[in-house]
Amino acid sequence: MGQEQSQTANGTSPSGYRVLIVEDNPHIIEMYSYVLKKLAANELKGTTPLEVHFAADGHAAMTLLTDSPFHLVMTDLYMPVMDGFQLIEKIRSEPALKSLPVVAISAGGQDAKDRAMKLGVTSYLKKPVRFADVMDTVKQLLRIT
């Protein structure tokens, strides 16, 4: 698997929601892909595209974020090259990205959650995450009713 991947969850053109998932574990990437495809099919019903991009680390994520706009970032906190904490700091320091919703996702303990919250994440999910929690968080932050 390469550093960056892209797919449109409902097969339509990329003119709707754009979500960036930053994760280095291929199995977890598959789970997010499945959940977001379900969200596109069940909640958006093909009316609004949900374009999902994947990056394996914070550096690849920043490249994508500076190349084009996104509506939501969901990031693991522990990854090689540039971890999620560093990514959150970079996002919050960029004027154009400062208000971008960021969800931190980690199996780390309370210290990881506290650190992520202090850095300015919008939301935090603890691994292992439940499908419903991912879907509810994405719906809430993208304001999907």
Spans of features found by a protein language model:
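Receiver (REC) domain active-site loop signature in two-component systems and cognate sites
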Residues: 79
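C-terminal output helix
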Residues: 129-139
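Active-site residues of response regulator receiver
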Residues: 76
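Two-component/phosphorelay signaling modules centered on CheY-like receiver
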Residues: 26-53
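Conserved acidic carboxylate
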Residues: 23
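Acidic, metal-coordinating helix/loop segments flanking the phosphotransfer/catalytic sites
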Residues: 46-72
